[in-house]
């Protein structure tokens, strides 16, 4: 993966912590499971061994993914984010034009930090892609699987 990914310092540290746990804890636990399953004898019909090897494969893939993301990461400083347009790490306040009483707020983040429950949406999501580069007052139509959403951007800001 040579695509640059943009993370907050917290997001970068979370990925680093996950990598540390996988490398120093989980990997060792799985190797112990494999050794234990091997001790049971015939590996050709050993479901325990097969399951442990599958788990090892998944862990090694995740380790590789995390290492790749961390090496391609650019840590963004929220203090340096402009608010003239919607960028990654900006928050936006939107008015639903189909229901003007509904005001929603999103913060645009990388896919790695997206958390819809916390109002953090990926810049690669349909909503994120529709908002990037827009300014206050812009009316946006967002195509989602259920149809179209119509919003007006009321405010662009950076959360502390």
Swiss-Prot record:
Coiled coil: 45-74
One Pfam family cited in the UniProt record for this chain: GreA_GreB_N
Domain of life: Bacteria
GO MF annotation, one: RNA polymerase binding
Biological process terms in GO annotation: DNA-templated transcription elongation; regulation of DNA-templated transcription elongation
UniProt keywords, alphabetically: Coiled coil, DNA-binding, Transcription, Transcription regulation
Function as written in the Swiss-Prot or TrEMBL entry: Necessary for efficient RNA polymerase transcription elongation past template-encoded arresting sites. The arresting sites in DNA have the property of trapping a certain fraction of elongating RNA polymerases that pass through, resulting in locked ternary complexes. Cleavage of the nascent transcript by cleavage factors such as GreA or GreB allows the resumption of elongation from the new 3'terminus. GreA releases sequences of 2 to 3 nucleotides.
Family (UniProt): Belongs to the GreA/GreB family.
Record-given protein name: Transcription elongation factor GreA
Lineage: Bacteria, Pseudomonadati, Chlorobiota, Chlorobiia, Chlorobiales
Name of the gene this protein is made from: greA
